[in-house]
Amino acid sequence: MNRVKRAIIMAAGYGNRMLPITHTIPKPLIKVNGISMIETIIQALLKNEIEEIYIVVGYLKEQFKMLTKKYPMVSLIENPYFESCNNISSLYVAREHLEEAMILDGDQIIYNKDILSPNFHCSGYNCVWTEDYTEEWLLSAEGNRIVSCSRSGGSKGWQLYSISRWTREDGRKLKEQLELEFEIRRNRQIYWDDVPMF
């Protein structure tokens, strides 16, 4: 059994799907039922005793500083590429923290701490089987391996949630692959998920 020791929360993007609200506030800081989305994540991580928390910031980054005061275990990592690159750049700037890590998007609402359980068998994503049509990413798997991913959605597949866990070894491999794609191949318009999946 593997155990997550740290979390990387991706929060550098513009949140275009929530315009005009995100003109003045980053999407992860939008409050739902009186609490920001990202704080539901932080609190669930803390309840799971995951206390090494990194938030990758970019757009309106100064607004995240209050989180480091409220939660001293939170560290901010600035993504200087967020305006010109896809989210591969956010994981690239956090690549030193990928071993035994959980990676998740900051614009999720976590009410059940068990969703962020630190215990896991092998590296991979949180998914749920769906028979119904979804526009979310849909994975096909054989055993413990992802064999394909439809970004346009579909039905009868594993709907991807943006929560993944990585062993020490797989975290090292992911770091190497991120460096290869971002530095050498200069693939800067891809999703970070493209690196381990494709």
Regions found by a protein language model. Name each.
Residues 24-39:
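Short catalytic helix/loop segments, enriched in acidic residues and glycine
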Residues 112-186:
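Conserved core of the sugar-phosphate nucleotidyltransferase
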Residues 65-137, 141:
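Conserved beta-loop-beta/alpha segment of the NTase-like Rossmann-fold superfamily
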Residues 35-52, 93:
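A short, N-terminal amphipathic alpha-helix
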Residues 5, 51, 99:
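Short acidic/polar active-site loop segments enriched in Thr and Asp
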Residues 60-62:
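A conserved acidic beta->alpha catalytic loop
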Residues 183-198:
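Catalytic core and acceptor-binding pocket of nucleotide-sugar-dependent glycosyltransferases
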Residues 1-23:
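N-terminal nucleotide-binding beta1-loop-alpha1 segment
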